[in-house]
Amino acid sequence: QNWAKFKEKHIRSTSSIDCNTIMDKAIYIVGGKCKERNTFIISSEDNVKAICSGVSPDRKELSTTSFKLNTCIRDSITPRPCPYHPSPDNNKICVKCEKQLPVHFVGIGKC
């Protein structure tokens, strides 16, 4: 995965996320099945990129500040469209950095 895909999958400028609509997009369908969960970072691209600024070599990095988050969690295994519910949070995030850019969302709160 690269920075462009990471942005598309995880960064949003607004916290008003309709999980049921957004999670039915092709990028969240894995092997023909609905993805179990996806975390959205409510922030500017520059703030998220800053996590990897100066990080060398490529590695996982924990943000020094907390981000507003919204995780869409699948309620049940059903045919598409799958039902999801939002789980808001405010926490540090761990991302995988490559060439000083976030390319993979690792987790919330720790690496």
Curated annotation (Swiss-Prot):
Annotated PROSITE patterns: RNASE_PANCREATIC
Residues bearing the modification Pyrrolidone carboxylic acid: Q1
Gene3D superfamilies, A to Z: Ribonuclease A-like domain
Keyword Ubl conjugation: no
GO MF annotations, alphabetized: lyase activity; nucleic acid binding; ribonuclease A activity
Keyword Transmembrane helix: no
GO cellular component: extracellular region
Name recorded for this polypeptide: Ribonuclease, liver
Transmembrane segment boundaries: none
Cellular location(s): Secreted
GO biological process, one term: defense response to Gram-positive bacterium
Assigned keywords, A-Z: Disulfide bond, Endonuclease, Hydrolase, Lyase, Nuclease, Pyrrolidone carboxylic acid, Secreted
Pfam families: RnaseA
Enzyme Commission identifier(s): 4.6.1.18
Highest taxon of the lineage: Eukaryota
Catalytic reaction list: an [RNA] containing cytidine + H2O = an [RNA]-3'-cytidine-3'-phosphate + a 5'-hydroxy-ribonucleotide-3'-[RNA]; an [RNA] containing uridine + H2O = an [RNA]-3'-uridine-3'-phosphate + a 5'-hydroxy-ribonucleotide-3'-[RNA]
